[in-house]
Each structure stands twice: as C-alpha cells, then as structure tokens.
Amino acid sequence: MKQNNYGGFFMENKALNNRLIIISIFVFLFFSALTLKLVNVQIINKDKYKKSLDDIKVDEVYSTSTPRGRIFDRNYNLLVDNVGVRTIYYKRKPETSTKTQIELAYKMADKIDLDYSKLAKTNLKEFYLVNNKDKVNKKITEKERELLKQRKITISDINNMKMERITDEELSNYDEKDKKAAYIYYLMNKGYYYDEKIIKTYASNEEFAYVSEHVKELKGFNVKLEWERKYLYGDTFKTILGSVSTNESGIPFELKDKYLSEGYSLNDRVGVSYLEYQYESLLKGDKATYLLNDDNSYTVIKDGIRGNDIVLTIDINLQKEVEQILTEEIVNAKMNNANTTYYNGSHVIITDPKTGEILAMASKQIVANNGEYKVYDNTPALLTNPVTPGSIVKGASMSVGYKTGAIDIGTKMLDECVKIRNTPAKCSWTKGLGYLDDVKALAYSSNAYQYKTAMKVAGANYYYNGPLTVPESAFETYRKVFLEYGLGEKTNIDLPVESYGYKGTSYESGHLLDMAIGQYDTYTPVQIASYISTLAANGNKYKLHLLKEVHEKTNNEKMGKVVRNIEPELIGTVDLEQKYKDRIKLGFESVMKSLGYGYMGTVPSPAGKTGTAESFYDSDGDGKIDVPTISKGFIGYAPSYDPKFAITVLSPNVRYSTNSEYTSPVNSKISSRVSNKVFEILK
C-alpha cells in the first residue's frame, strides 16, 4: 500500500508562504525607512543639509593671467619687463540671456573704438541667427524636422543648414555698427562661458573710465590692468629672448597638447619661442585664486604672484656693440667690396671658455630691398644653419694625428700637392712653404700637412697619382676626436631648437683628406663656439648656456633672493696628453703672428686660427646648391695664458668664385673690432 505524501507537501507550502511574508514585511519596512530619510533630507532638514553640502563644496576660480618673471643680463640690467595695459573684459553672469548679451554688445559698440576687421563671415551669420531666430527657423522644412524627430539627422545638422541658408543679401542689411556689435558679441562668447573674455586691450582713458563707472548696468563687463612684455633694449637680442602668446591667441595650436597636459587653460598666455619658451616653467606667474560666492561675487583666497626673475649670461652692452659692428661691416662689405654677390651676413659668438657662459651671440642678414640694403636679425641661424668650417678645424685635426701616433712634437713634412689617381691635385693655399713642423703647419695653415697626417692615420700607402684606399674606420677616428671638442653633436644649449649639422656619407679616400681640413662635414656656429671654448679651456668641454641665476618669485620691484645658481657643467674632456694640447695652443699663438695677425685687434696675447672654405650656395632657392663660393672663418681666445673669452666669427659665401681672387676682409674686420670691444668691456 502506497504512503500518502499530500500532508508533507502542504507543510512545505505553508513554510514557504511564511518566509515570503517575512521578506515582504522587511522590504516594506526598509523602503518606509528610506522614504522617511528622504523626506527628512529633502523637506524637513533641507536647509541644514544644504549648508553642510555648501561647507564641503568650494568653487575655486583662477584669474586669467599673472605677469611673468623679468629677464636681466649678467650685470642685472633689466632686459624684459611687464607694463600695465588698460583692458576691457567680459565675464558672463549666469542669469544673462542671449537677448541681454546682444543689447550689451550694441551698447558697447557705441562706446568703444574697436577694429572688427577680423570678424569672419561665420561670426556674422551666428549674430544674424541669434537676432532673427524665428526668421531663420523658417528656413528648415517640415521634412527636415521630421528627419530630426526620427533621429536620421542631428540638431547639429539642422544648425548647419540654418547657417548655410543665411544669404549675403540678408547680411548686407548690417551696417558698420551692427558689424562692430557682432564682433563684440563674438568676443563675449569665445571660448568657455566661465572664462574672462578680452574685449579690448590698450583701451583709451575715456573707454576705461566709462566701463569702470558703469559696471552694474553693463552686467559682466569690467576693466583691469593686463600686462605686456616690454623690451628695454629694443630689438637687441630680442629674437633669442623669445615671445609670449597674446590674450587673443592663448596657447598656440601646435603647443596645445604640451601645455594642456601641464594644467594650463586654452586662453593662457605662454612662452612660444626661444628663452620665453625654454624657461616657461620659471617665468610663468602663479594665478590668483578666488572663491566663487553664492551671489557670483569673488573672495580672494590667494593673490597672484609674478614669475621667477631670471638672470642671463649675456652682457647686454657687449651684445649691443656686437650687433652694431655686424650691421656696419656687413653693409660696408655689400656696398663696397667686390665679389660679394652671394654674401648675405655673418655670425659672432663670444663665450667664457672656463664656464660655458655665452657673453654675446648675434647673426645678421642683409637683404636688398628696392635698391636699398636692409639688415635683419638672424641669430637663430647660429643654432640651425651649418657652415663649412675650413681650416679652423685644424686644431682638432692635429689632435687626431697626435693621439693616433701619426705625428709627434716636431714632426716635419714637406708641403706639396697630393694627387690621387683620377682626381684633381689637392694643394695648400700657396706654394713654397717647404718643410714644416707641427707648429708651423698650423701657423701657415698647411693643407698638405693635414693630408699626409690623415693618410698616416688611415695606414694608407700613398704615392703621387696612385690609387689610395682608406678604411671607413679612419673617418670615425676623426669624428670621435672632433666630438670631444663638440663638433658634430648638439651642444644642448638651453634653447629649444638646434641642429646637428651635416655628416658626410661617402667614404671615398679623398673625402678623408677633405675632412682633415674642414671641407667635408659641416657644423653649426654654436658647435664651432663649443670647439674653440674647449680648446681654450685646456680640453675641458663645458656646456654652453644662457641662464645664470634664478630668483624667487615676488611682486616687488626688488629682485627676490637667488634660489638657483647655474654652475659650470663639465660635459666632456679631450683625451689627449697635455704636451700635445700645449703644442696646439702654441700653434694657435703662432697663427696670430702670421696669417691671423690683426684678427683680434690689439688684444694682448691672442691665440686663434683663420679658416677659408670652399662652399656652395643655392642661388635660386630651389633647394639645390649650385654656385661655388668661398667662406671665411676665425676662432680665437685671449689672453692665451689665461683665457677670459673665446670668439667665433663666420662669414659664409663671402666671395663668389670668379676669375678674381679678391676676397672681402669683412670677417677679419668684424673679428678685430669685436675682440677689441670685448677686451674693453671685460677688462
């Protein structure tokens, strides 16, 4: 007989129902409690909780701009300062409607003189649209509205249609006042709504006073003193000092990612070139911080403060003299010297070889304009425009010979033409120099001595008009030593742009001989300045730099205390025995008694090296060098026994290679005058 299980089934059902009842009661009580809590928070104690929220919610707003740090020269002459600029700005209030904004734009159009030439047609259409909403809305068809409802087009598509359908005829009804108001309206709404919008800088006294006296009725318009950079020495060194973006431009597009990642706002004024860019983190000011109150007023939390003042290594009085000398001599050469068809400027760099400090650096370019010559600053070329150095590299070339054992102190060789099969003969600049030792080879700038040394370095077997084979390693032997002097590598000077120069890619034997006399690889003027500085400093290569001191931030006229001194940074040494370094120095001293006589004016105990290079010029601007020219160079230092300064003077394409042998003396004139001026100022 089967057992009856119905009783067990009903017992289980009853237990399940009891559990459901208990859960339902619990859920009911939970939501009842939650409802009571919400009533308490949102109705009964609303003000209490709102106050608590306000206590922990702080709306901090930052001012738009703070003056940058000032820039001084090494003698604390002020180079770059900030000057106040009367500025009218607009900051939209939350309750301000579009209609009110339009009214304000027209009111301001009556009161301020504003150039609206930058008003784009799109901006004018936008102004027309907000002024004629009903009329413009009728330009959208019912079919298009239906497509919008069906989400087949977007509201953005609709707005674009409206803009496209506003006709030129409709816009032609706008007069000058309308256009000025349209431009003001555009400026009022440019960028983020919560930003201060610059409406006009350099406002007149009357405009400034009007806005100041009518702040309440102008609802968002106000005035303040903004700042602009002032250059106390005019255009002297101005290019390298750099530039700062305007209120209107804010962060340039190409620098947007960099600056936004560092916490900047799009409308911030930032350094965009050279030293202003390089030292943006020091020069930028700290913005004032305000607390946004419930009534939209502001309470100052933290005052703004000017950026760090910085002191440069530059001597501005020397810089000014160098630029003046360059300008005078370049113009004189172009107007009065023959064979200067393709000569268009010269370069000068003055350094302290014991520290790497740059005392002056300038390059000037001359351009014919309507029959007259105009001179422009070209100082960035010192960093980016490589030159063929010629014989000025022979000090480094001698180092290669000594280091490899190819030559030694007193090694003599006959100065004679070298001829490799199927190539033209390679000779010195003049004949009859005879047998020369290492010092006289420098003094008389013997090419043959360097050719023969290079062949020894390469382990090559040479005979006149025979084949010559050299290993690639010989090129690298030269380049390695040249690098120790700073030739062929970036100097990493504290400026944002610099190039390497050109490194030849052919390893033909003749090119090794060319390299030994500075006719193969090319170097930037700043690399050549590093080379002569290293040689003058007994083989110690100090990093070239322009920053000397950083001072703490302050709003006072007086500079803050020094927070950072830039110490000389030794970045390398020339691996060469002292006796050989002394021999090269002796050769450089001998140069100044022969080919280099007068190149350093009347400066006592000079040492240096002249250079002549066969170069080429792109005569038609097509990117191809097509005209053979001659370039001149000079490097030196003084006094030879305790160098106080090193000088680099380069004049590319100074002679057009015609049948005439005449070469303008512009390079020696610049070098002589500048050297005298340096000694006069520094002694």
What are these regions (language model features)?
Residues 96, 116, 245-254, 407, ...:
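Short helix-capping/linker segments at secondary-structure and domain boundaries
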Residues 653-670:
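A short acidic/glycine-rich loop-to-helix N-cap element
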Residues 557, 665-683:
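Short, gly/Ser/Thr-rich active-site loops of penicillin-recognizing serine hydrolases
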Residues 78-81, 86, 288-305, 314, ...:
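Beta-lactam-recognizing serine transpeptidase/beta-lactamase-like catalytic domain environment
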Residues 99-110, 209, 213, 238, ...:
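Solvent-exposed, polar/charged alpha-helical surfaces in well-ordered, non-transmembrane soluble domains
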Residues 196, 295-341:
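Conserved, well-ordered alpha-helix/loop/beta-strand core segments that scaffold catalytic motifs
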Residues 2-277, 281-298, 302, 346-347, ...:
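Membrane-proximal periplasmic segments of bacterial cell-envelope enzymes
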Residues 95-115, 325, 375-393:
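Short, solvent-exposed cationic patches
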